[in-house]
Amino acid sequence: AARRPNPRDLYHGLWYEGEVCCLFADSNLGKSIYAVQMADAIARQQNVLYMDCELSDKQFQLRYYDVENNIRHIFPDGLIRAEIDPEAISMDNYEDTIIKNIEDAAIVTNSNVIIIDNLTYLCNASDKGEAAGIFMMKLMQLKKKHNFSILIIAHTPKRNLANPITQNDLAGSKKLYNFFDSVFAIGKSYKDNCLRYVKQVKVRAGEYRYDSDNVLIYEIVSDRGFLHFEHIGYAQE
């Protein structure tokens, strides 16, 4: 192990090379915006496969278009966006088919970094412990087979904003949490609805940089068609 290189930091200490990582948050807090922002940054160095199960290609195009100034954000060539149409996949061996499609797309596009938005489409039974555990085992096998780095977007049930984010806020089984190498979450400030914060919940590589005493503070802005989280400081959760 000592002879192998240390895993590279893919994005601000939140996700490291070779990890299966999870980003979770409540609805409408900007999970996909943050994930695309990560993909945009990483794709300037290497290919990134972004599996989008949330937006159509037109919705995605409009999200990154400044209508007033007629400016479209230009993503790096290394960012490859793909869509999964769940209606085109048989419910027999649904999860196996999804994983095979992801594997094939990653190989064809020469992408070792994969972002999957979101967990609901990947695993029909993600809230059922046994099925979720089996699915994550298959995903871990895929990671080990190709040395992929995989980020999975997930939901959290409605939560009290005054309470700190914990692993218990991740929707689904505890088994899901145990399989992830690292986990971080997006929360909304209960003092200012316009602000978001990012907190690390689980770390295996690196260190806890952004715990409850030092969360990343952001506001969501659009600059020349690029909708993104703009870092404005640090704070206690």
Where in the sequence are the language-model features?
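Short gly/ser/thr-rich secondary-structure transition/capping motifs
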Residues: 2-9, 164-167
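Conserved inter-motif catalytic segment of the P-loop NTP-binding fold
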Residues: 5-6, 10-12, 16, 46-134, ...
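Phosphate-binding/switch region of NTP-binding enzymes
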Residues: 22-23, 28, 33, 45-47, ...
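Hydrophobic positions on the alpha1 helix immediately C-terminal to the Walker A/P-loop
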Residues: 34, 38
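Residues immediately C-terminal to the Walker A/P-loop in P-loop NTPase nucleotide-binding domains
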Residues: 41-42
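C-terminal regulatory/interaction module of P-loop NTP-utilizing enzymes
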Residues: 228-231
